[in-house]
């Protein structure tokens, strides 16, 4: 849009555009705009008014310039005259079209916020089935002559048989099994939830889970099952002891599975929940805050339970030497904090229009001839004020480093920056940005006021410009303010076991603003001896605008401090302060907006917002510690299983992925390995260590139940006769290695020394190679005869390749199509190899029936704050820590 200065000559006044650019850029732009105006002079004079008036257009790209009239009609000319006819309309033009600048606001990263809020206590670990590795399976029985009987026998086999071949790979399989158990390990087991009806029961009894019921059905229907076992199954039912809140359920489990589930039952994480626990769960500062009225539901059932969150502090010290990881954590904390900092809505702020009118009157804008003073009003809007308020508090809560964006020629921004540096500790700003801002304030306002020469600051100087100026300035009030600002640091205080970064008491109660105002008034009274009068007047007017709002600035400082400290009570991780890799940008024009538009309305977080913020922090912190425990356990297990090829980096990557917020591929390798080293130093949590020891003690039993691998192979120079085996018939299987010289297959492959094997075979001594090998079955007699000469011995001696070894199970029994070729027993089948395969554990019903005990019933509550109803006092009555209203200026 356009506005006019009455009585001004169009030819004499320069075009004033691009007010926020540096002077060099401004000159180029002014020349361009003047040329454009000269081309349009004649057209405008014809189409608008005959009087000589200046038309100044705003150069913003995103605003359509109403002053650019393209062959407009007479009605459009009338509308333009109406807009310009009153002073009020004229000021609205200034506010909305010319002097208003859109400040880029923070774009909330919803995906990160959602990831944080989606981290919940592990409800998925509420099991509906018992943990099982084994299941019983029926296998046929073979007679002495190799014919299959009609009878079957039950053996324990793996539910999911995915064992690889090779000793190293098998150990890696056990590591993956351990990892899977850690993921599935339940925090609590309530057998009543998983119990199902026993179909064979006489009195509608229940067994512990559906798999137990299926096993009972299969055994009950098996013709080989004894009558006493059937009667026992018919009597299987739960036993309830209501007075003790206990129930026993019958279960069918392999002894190893029973050991796991018994351990889970005896080491549950649930604890009794009562009102005292809920009371202590609420942060103490929220409980004691008179602005919040909390009421607790006292009707907790006696069966209420909860899982205590794991809130250990600083186990990995990610703030120390993990720049990339720490930056991600602080970024996600910043996004979360911004979502909970209350908004300064337009109704809580002074009307932007009214405030700009008042500022225009204070500045006497009608008489302005200096371009810099028009910038005082640039960028003042409620959106920028709200953005600044949220940025300051969220950055302090998350300890995110801020960088300042400002224009040196905008004195109002620099004066607002003096308030900012007074209130916000220096640590919060990027060092380079802080130095640039301080240097601009010193060279634009402070030194010119006293007639001192410009400060020439050396890059890399350990002192900041304010620290240098403090030593050189003689004026007590200004030096006193500089001293406070230079020493404005967070005080580290441990509250409720959490390291908090607290503000200086003078900032919390707002008294420091009086110190700032004394310094500003001293500066405005100085003569600026080396500067023109207009320069001095501009600075004085800027200071006047800020000093007119002394009361509001005190209130603003108290409001920022109160909101910060109240939300800080909900932070559960230590607030470690380290400069972050990336920074949050803060424009000083938005600080001006906040200073100028803050009203007398108190804005404090709602209790629901506080509870939400607290819950999200607790859930993330607890999940963080649990995932650390998992990673430490996996690293320890990999070392104890001698997984020398295992890449520890992959374990660390899995750990970071499970924390949800990290973009793992972007994390530098050096930080990955440093993280690995820190994880190695931590002790393994007790439950996880016990579970690993259970696996370690039973590895052989688990291997034995697999159909995929054999435990070794016996090779000989002369043929060995096939023997009868009850599970397979006539086969080349050895069930023990008694009498054989044994060599570890993994060691053999690592060393490559086959001389010992060759010598033993040539001396006609069979040798047993012990290790996990693929268990391949072949039942054809024809193929057996064909392979008599293709012995493993030939491969060992000639090819020197043990990894090609695939022992074959030669089946000669009634299942074979060729069985009747050898039924006369005149020909005795032989083989130069024997497969060493351990016998799986037979299924014994009596040994597999276990009674499991758990609570009859309890209810686990994940959100303890749901029992608390909360409200706030009237915001206008809200008081700060000093028992005075937060906002005193009414």
Swiss-Prot record:
Residues 19-30 have a biased composition (Basic and acidic residues). It comes from the Viruses. One of its GO terms (molecular function) is RNA binding. Keywords: Capsid protein, Inner capsid protein, Repeat, RNA-binding, T=2 icosahedral capsid protein, Ubl conjugation, Virion. It is found in: Virion. InterPro entries: Rotavirus_VP2. Residues 404-424, 432-452 are annotated as: Hydrophobic. Residues 1-88 are annotated as: 5-fold hub. Its main location: virion. One of its GO terms (cellular component) is viral nucleocapsid. Disulfide bonds: none annotated. Belongs to the rotavirus VP2 family. Inner capsid protein that self-assembles to form an icosahedral capsid with a T=2 symmetry, which consists of 120 copies of VP2, with channels at each of its five-fold vertices. This capsid constitutes the innermost concentric layer of the viral mature particle. It encapsidates the polymerase VP1, the capping enzyme VP3 and the genomic dsRNA, thereby defining the core. The N-terminus binds RNA. It is necessary for encapsidation of VP1 and VP3. The N-termini of 10 VP2 molecules form a cylindrical hub underneath each 5-fold axis of the inner capsid. Homodecamer; each decamer is made up of two conformers of VP2, called VP2A and VP2B. Interacts with a VP1-VP3 complex. Interacts with the intermediate capsid protein VP6. Interacts with NSP5. Interacts (via N-terminus) with NSP2. This is Inner capsid protein VP2.
